[in-house]
Curated annotation (Swiss-Prot):
Belongs to the G-protein coupled receptor 1 family. GO terms for biological process: cellular response to pH; G protein-coupled receptor signaling pathway; inflammatory response; insulin secretion; monocyte differentiation; negative regulation of monocyte differentiation; osteoclast development; positive regulation of insulin secretion involved in cellular response to glucose stimulus. It comes from the Eukaryota. It comes from Homo sapiens (Human). This is G-protein coupled receptor 68. One of its GO terms (molecular function) is G protein-coupled receptor activity. The lineage of its organism: Eukaryota, Metazoa, Chordata, Craniata, Vertebrata. Changing residue 67 to N: Impaired ability to sense protons. The gene is GPR68. Residues 50-53, 126-133, 215-218, 290-365 are cytoplasmic.
Length: 365
């Protein structure tokens, strides 16, 4: 339980933190154990996409870097909740960890939106908008997204985020009831950081589904795979981000008393914990469903087997060379694995597409 001062002078709220302190460690440990290795692999596969001149890799790498930044802040938050919401580090570290926690949401939303728009342009308008589907354009968009969130972060650095409760606990990034300056930034976050991107994302995936249904060169099984991927992407996106933003808006509009803050505290913090699972869902949805990723995993597995066997027998390099026919042959035999939204159907390719130029080679479905 903590007695948290909202503005250090006028009002304090005593709120039971028991549920938050019970659930948060479980979520943080799960995201650390699963999310860190998954995002490291995702970063590697994003690099391979960039190496193949696929602009999708730029968005994947930026999305993964944002997730890794947040994951690296989790040990601090884990210590915080295990110490009964008592921040034992400096004020600046609280601000940095808080920024990594909250801004990761909007950086992730931004890059997920970019990926959806990029896939829509590739599928629905394969012969147009080439200038928007280049590495240079992707880097430019990425710079804008990071700059927007860094500028927003400066706003938080101007305010004190570590306050002391009646038990001399130093609480971090918690103000109850919500402060006036927070309302303005929350409205901005809801409208620009969530509502606009989700409208773009939903419109993009609706356009992808429409284009796939109209495609006569795509097998029904592959159409079903794409539809399942799109549906799961939207459902996971909404599950991770919608509850938090609904409650963020509710708090910003109506929270003016301690009683209201107490009433929404558990639901608000539960919804905030849900956003953490996006760090696990991102690499699964956007990397591990790709056929090229299956192929790269086979090659990576072959390399690891080569290293381990070599250390024992000294002959593994001949048995399991990186990219050996055994590994690539397996991928070839599984040519029906879904490339889904990371590749273009041959019917959509132009003479400029790689293996001839500007689009990724392969199939959409």
């Amino acid at each position: 339980m903590g007695n948290i001062t909202a503005d250090n002078s006028s009002m304090s709220c005593t709120i039971d933190h028991t549920i938050h302190q019970t659930l948060a460690p479980v979520v943080y440990v799960t995201v650390l154990v699963v999310g860190f290795p998954a995002n490291c692999l995702s970063l590697y596969f994003g690099y391979l996409q960039i190496k193949a001149r696929n602009e999708l890799g730029v968005y994947l790498c930026n999305l993964t870097v944002a997730d890794l930044f947040y994951i690296c802040s989790l040990p601090f938050w884990l210590q915080y909740v295990l110490q009964h919401d008592n921040w034992s580090h400096g004020d600046l570290s609280c601000q940095v960890c808080g920024i990594l926690l909250y801004e990761n949401i909007y950086i992730s939303v931004g890059f997920l939106c970019c990926i959806s728009v990029d896939r829509y342009l590739a599928v629905a308008h394969p012969f147009r908008f080439h200038q928007f589907r280049t590495l240079k354009a992707a880097v430019g968009v990425s710079v804008v997204i990071w700059a927007k969130e860094l500028l927003t972060s400066i706003y938080f650095l101007m305010h004190e985020e570590v306050i002391e409760d009646e038990n001399q606990h130093r609480v971090c990034f918690e103000h109850y009831p919500i402060q006036a300056w927070q309302r303005a930034i929350n409205y901005y976050r809801f409208l620009v950081g969530f509502l606009f991107p989700i409208c773009l994302l939903l419109a993009s995936y609706q356009g992808i589904l429409r284009a796939v249904r109209r495609s006569h060169g795509t097998q029904k099984s592959r159409k079903d795979q794409i539809q399942r991927l799109v549906l799961s992407t939207v459902v996971i996106f909404l599950a991770c981000f919608l509850p938090y933003h609904v409650l963020l808006l509710v708090r910003s509009v109506w929270e003016a008393s301690c009683d209201f803050a107490k009433g929404v505290f558990n639901a608000y913090h539960f919804s905030l914990l849900l956003t953490s699972f996006n760090c696990v869902a991102d690499p699964v949805l956007y990397c591990f469903v790709s056929e090229t990723t299956h192929r790269d995993l086979a090659r990576l597995r072959g390399a690891c087997l080569a290293f381990l066997t070599c250390s024992r027998t000294g002959r593994a390099r001949e048995a399991y060379p990186l990219g050996a026919p055994e590994a690539s042959g397996k991928s070839g035999a599984q040519g029906e694995e879904p490339e889904l939204l990371t590749k273009l159907h041959p019917a959509f390719q132009t003479p400029n597409s790689p293996g001839s130029g500007g689009f990724p080679t392969g199939r959409l479905a």
